[in-house]
């Protein structure tokens, strides 16, 4: 499936565009962009790199190191955005609050934002920060696709049970905007499914492909 997905070839041409500390430093609000968010240490950088087949996000050993919105151009009208890691205990509270203010401003005001990938560690899902992201997405009626990362850390049955449990809660609270799946960067589990979501949000699928995905 991934060989037929146009997002793969496009991501191979991705290039760093700009880093922004706040919304007014972002690129012009036009075209389409998809953002990647996640609590620090939830595997956001690994997921982004695996989905794009590129080393777009530096996988750091120090969670929370990325403090800026990092934009990557796929072509003249499509972008990916690596949002700051959030929630790590060693980050000072004022800095956490600063990140939250600017994340909320970005999510609520960015017209070109087509959707958000939210990374949740399958062993520690639905943290306060995860719920906050879901609330922001719902308030803006913005599609949000949850990747339950590090699924390889659990046995298959346990991972499925965790998915079902979280899915029930997500559907009850944020079902109008949120979808979710299992994901493992090392095992490449769930990569094709997530790439299809990414391609759809960026307007890369034709009508036949979208109908197939919805069937």
From Swiss-Prot:
Pfam families registered for this protein in UniProt: MMR_HSR1
One record GO biological process: division septum assembly
GO molecular function, one term: GTP binding
GO CC term (a single one): cytosol
Binding site for GTP: 38-45, 64-68, 82-85, 149-152, 182-185
Cofactor(s) required, per the database record: Mg(2+)
Keywords attached to this entry: Cell cycle, Cell division, GTP-binding, Magnesium, Metal-binding, Nucleotide-binding, Septation
The UniProt record lists the keyword DNA-binding: no
PROSITE patterns (alphabetical): G_ENGB
Residue ranges occupied by any EngB-type G domain in the UniProt entry: 30-204
Amino-acid positions noted as binding Mg(2+) in the UniProt annotation, renumbered to this chain: 45, 66
Superkingdom classification of source: Bacteria
PANTHER family with a match to the protein in the record: ENGB-TYPE G DOMAIN-CONTAINING PROTEIN (PTHR11649:SF13), MSS1/TRME-RELATED GTP-BINDING PROTEIN (PTHR11649)
Role this protein plays: Necessary for normal cell division and for the maintenance of normal septation.
Family of this protein: Belongs to the TRAFAC class TrmE-Era-EngA-EngB-Septin-like GTPase superfamily. EngB GTPase family.
UniProt cross-references to HAMAP family, sorted A to Z: GTPase_EngB
Protein name: Probable GTP-binding protein EngB
Organism of origin: Pseudomonas aeruginosa (strain UCBPP-PA14)
Record gene name: engB
């Amino acid at each position: 499936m991934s060989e037929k997905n146009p997002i793969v070839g496009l991501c191979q041409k991705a290039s760093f565009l700009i880093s922004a500390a706040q919304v007014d430093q972002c690129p012009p609000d036009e075209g389409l962009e998809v953002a990647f968010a996640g609590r620090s240490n939830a595997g956001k950088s690994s997921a982004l790199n695996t989905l794009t087949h590129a080393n777009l996000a530096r996988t750091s050993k120090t969670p929370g190191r990325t403090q800026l919105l990092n934009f990557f151009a796929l072509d003249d009208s499509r972008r990916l955005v690596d949002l700051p890691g959030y929630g790590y205990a060693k980050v000072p509270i004022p800095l956490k609050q600063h990140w939250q203010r600017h994340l909320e401003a970005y999510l609520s005001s960015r017209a070109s934002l087509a959707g958000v990938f939210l990374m949740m560690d399958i062993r520690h899902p639905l943290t306060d920060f995860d719920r906050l992201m879901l609330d922001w997405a719902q308030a803006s009626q913005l599609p949000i696709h949850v990747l339950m990362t590090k699924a390889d850390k659990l046995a298959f049955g346990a991972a499925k049970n965790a998915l079902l449990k979280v899915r029930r809660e997500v559907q009850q609270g944020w079902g109008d905007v949120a979808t979710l799946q299992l994901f493992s960067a090392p095992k490449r589990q769930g990569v094709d499914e997530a790439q299809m979501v990414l391609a759809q949000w960026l307007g890369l699928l034709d009508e036949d492909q979208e109908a197939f995905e919805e069937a």
